[in-house]
Amino acid sequence: MAKSKGISVNYLRNKEQLNDEIDYKEFKYKKYFELVCKLIPDVKNETLIVKAINEELTNKEGIVYVFVINGKIFKVGESINSIKDRVQSYNCGKLEYRLKGTCSTTNFYVLQSLLAIGEEVEVYGYFPELPEYTLFGEKYKSSKSASKVAENLIIKDFIEEYNKKPIGCTQQ
C-alpha cells in the first residue's frame, strides 16, 4: 500500500481487479433497482461525469445505489441526497486533497479506483419509501433511516451469501 505523509493512497489500479467480484445479474435485490445514470471517468480533470438516464431519479433524494462496471458490482451505497450530489462528493476524492488529508478515504478510494479502471459505471438505484416523522409538531419525510437500513440489509446479505462485501465498500 502506497503511503504519503502517513496517509493511505491505496485504490484499485485496473479493471482486472474486479474479476472476482459478484456479477450484478446474481444480485438478489436487482428487481428493485433501475438504471438511474452512468458515470463517465474524466481522468484529465480527475472527476466523474454524471450522464443521466432518468433525470428525475438522478436528482431524487434518498437512494440506495449499486455501482456496476462491466457487469461486476463495485459498490453498494446509500445517500440521503441524490446520486448526482453523492457523485459530487466522490469528486472531492482528488489525490491532492488526500495527500493534504482533506478528503475522506471513501471518496478518495472510489474516485481514484473508477478513474484508474477507466470504464463507464452503471448506477442502479432503489428509492425506499420515505418514512414520515413528526418533530416539534411538524411532519417531515426523511430518507436517512430507510435508505441506511436498506444499505445495511443488502451488505449483510451480500456478506452472508458471498462471504465478502463489494470491493468498493471500504467502510466497516
For each feature predicted by the language model, list its residue ranges.
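Boundary/linker segments flanking structured domains
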Residues: 1-62, 68-74, 79-172
